């Protein structure tokens, strides 16, 4: 399969620092300082509010890697905590369909620790790029992508973690069609209570219970997102491209129907119940009627994912066992997490300096010292 992220190598300025143990590159006007373990070719492969991502060659493993720089990582407590959460989560996890952190590059001195450099496995592209490209997608491609998403999600959920932000850009793919789930900055454990206070999860893939501000939600929110993503793969366009909350709910009810009273047991808020009851009554449209030409078994699985009542939504284990995935499903090759993940740093009083210290310790724990590096 072709990939769509072949970014050309840039000519970048590089300067050895700290006696050659570190190298500072200037990438699109941004300083990018890494240990000498990481060598060119350097390619910028992503940029966002957090900072910049570049690919480099890891002289220890002999493989290309993705290095994400989070600039001024401790200026904002919420952002810093998000970084700490992703580091701890991904270092806890060990699964073929979850992207791995291979290193956290510690700075030369603790005093200089303002930017965080996280090293990940390098993938070629993501599902968003593939969906938007002219790349032909066969039924087998879509089926294999779905299987891998669910296989990774089974592991994540078994670790007592909800991803909460599954969307095509967070599903990384390589040329062999291997898929890995990424971006755990919004993830939560089931025991955490401040579920929706910090960030807004991408609207198009958001389950009804999130749109209705239900705080007691479950792993079913991720299953809803998978249903939306899989239909987008099959149909090459977003299933529910809502402009705002109201439009999002309208698009959902126009397709799957207005829920009955018996399907609203998960709503604790009288206002949310009243809102749903005042929506225009809609009957569900069978997916086989709306999406003619798409595999009926695939649509049957999607219909079981896109159920308004989260308690009636299919679980990840049941989805893996659905007839549509029979050719790929092997319960003996779909591992669960050995132990649940616990994130113990949610106290409102935790300071930026405390978070910095915790990330520093993570860097010490997983990176080689400069004297141990390949020069």
From Swiss-Prot:
Its cofactor is Mg(2+). PROSITE patterns: MAPK, PROTEIN_KINASE_ATP, PROTEIN_KINASE_DOM, PROTEIN_KINASE_ST. SUPFAM superfamilies: Protein kinase-like (PK-like) (SSF56112). InterPro entries: Kinase-like_dom_sf, MAP_kinase, MAP_kinase_CS, Prot_kinase_dom, Protein_kinase_ATP_BS, Ser/Thr_kinase_AS. ATP binds at residues 45-53, 68. A motif (TXY) lies at residues 197-199. Disruption phenotype: Significantly reduced chitin-induced cell wall-associated depositions. Reduced accumulation of PAL4, CHS, ERF2, alpha-DOX and LOX7 transcripts in response to chitin or chitosan. Susceptible to necrotrophic fungus B.cinerea, characterized by the symptoms of browning protonema and stems becoming visible 2 days after the infection leading to host cell death. The active site is at residue 165. Residues 39-325 form the Protein kinase domain. It is an enzyme of class 2 (transferase). The modification Phosphothreonine is found at residue 197. It is found in: Cytoplasm; Nucleus. The keyword Cell division does not apply. It catalyses: L-seryl-[protein] + ATP = O-phospho-L-seryl-[protein] + ADP + H(+); L-threonyl-[protein] + ATP = O-phospho-L-threonyl-[protein] + ADP + H(+). Induction: Up-regulated in response to chitosan within 15 minutes, peaks 8-fold at 2 h, and returns to basal levels by 8 h. GO terms for cellular component: cytoplasm; nucleus. Belongs to the protein kinase superfamily. CMGC Ser/Thr protein kinase family. MAP kinase subfamily. This is Mitogen-activated protein kinase 4a. It comes from Physcomitrium patens.
